[in-house]
Amino acid sequence: MQFYSWMHAINARNNWLVASLILAALPSHAALVDGHLEDEILPILQRNLAGTFAADAVIHDRETVTIGFVNFDPSGFIPIDDDNLGGDDANRLKNELKTITLPLTLALPWHGSVWESYVTGRLGYTQRFHDISLFEELDPSRDHEKLKIYSAFFAGGVHWDGLKNWRFTAELGGSIRRLEQEYTYNNAISQIFQPVFDGVLTNFSLNTWMLQPSLALQYQKRWSKHKLKYRSRYAYMHGESFGSDIPPHQVDIKASSWRNTLYYSHPIGRMLDISFAGQLSASRVDLSGNTNEAFQTPHYYEFGLDLLMGTGAYGEGWLDNVSIGLLFNYGSVLKGGSLVFNYNTY
C-alpha cells in the first residue's frame, strides 16, 4: 500500500490550492476535476492508488518483502549514524501495517525428466489503521484513516532442471484486489473538505485486476550438510482498475521488482526427526514504476539471520520447513529490524 496518507499529500500542496478548495466548498465531485484542481489533485490521487495496489502485490509476494510480527529500530543499539538503517517513523509505520498471506502450491501430474509443472495461489489481507494530524495550529484533533485491501492470486508455472545445480522457473499469474478506504473527519478544518473529498479521495472502494508474470534463476550447491544458494527473480506487474466511472479512480498499474539473494545454511543438529540449521541471507531488491514510488526508493537491501527447521515426516506433502529469525531492511520506507516467521522457505 502507499505508505503515506493521501490527505498528507494534499496537505503538502501549495497554500493557494487549499484556499481555493475552501472557497469553492462545492458539495459535488466536479470540484475535483475543474481547472487547476484537475492538474493538481487527480495525478496525486492516481499515483497513490497505483502505488497502493502495486505495494500490496509486493507485500504478499513472499519473495520480495517480509513484514515481521515484532518490529524494532536497530539504530538504538548499533552505533552507526545512518538514516537508512531505521528510525521512529519507519518503526511506527511497520507497527501500523498488518498483513495476512495464505499461500498454497501444488505439483501437477505433467512433468518430464528435467521439468515439472505446478500451480500456486494465495489469499491476502492488508490493513493500515492510523491517526492523521492536519492543521494542528488551528485544531489539534486528529483524523483517522482505515485502509483495507483484499486480494486473491492464482498462477501456474514450470521448473526446468536441465543443468546440474541450476533451476529455471517461469510463472504466469494474475490477481484481483479490492481496496476499501474509510476516513473519519474529526478535525474542524478538515471537515470543510469532506463534502468535496468523500467518494473520491476518502470513503470509497475500488477494484483492480493485475497480470503478474515472473522469471527466476537459482543455483544451489551442497557439500556435507551445508548449502549455498543464489536466487535471482524478476517479477512484473501490469493492471487496471475496474468498476468505477470516476476519472480519478481510473488507474493504470505498471511496476516491477528484481530480487537477488545469496543464502548460506549451516547444519546445527537433529531432534525427533526435525533438522535444525542456521541460515544467513543477503538480498538486494530493485524496484521500478509504481513500486519505486510506494517504497520511496529505487532499491533496498535485506539481511536475515534465521533458525530453519525441517519438518521431516510431520509435514510431508504440504509443509517442508518453518523458520524464525531476524530481518533487517536497509534503505526503504520499511527500514529497520523485525522478528519474522516463515514457512516453506525457498
Tell me the role of every PLM-derived stretch.
Residues 1-86, 111-115:
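Cleavable N-terminal export/targeting peptides
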Residues 35-43, 109-257, 263, 282, ...:
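Outer-membrane pore/translocation modules
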Residues 61-66, 225-227, 266-275:
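Short N-terminal helix-initiation segments at or just after the protein's N-terminus
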Residues 66-97, 129-147:
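Surface-exposed strand-loop-strand hairpins of Gram-negative outer-membrane beta-barrel proteins
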Residues 66-75, 111-122, 167-171, 227-231, ...:
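Residue-level detector of the transmembrane beta-barrel scaffold of outer-membrane proteins
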Residues 85-109, 116-118, 124-126:
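Long, compositionally biased low-complexity segments
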Residues 104-110, 156-162, 215-221, 266-270, ...:
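Residue-level signature of outer-membrane beta-barrel architecture
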Residues 240-346:
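Outer membrane beta-barrel transmembrane domains
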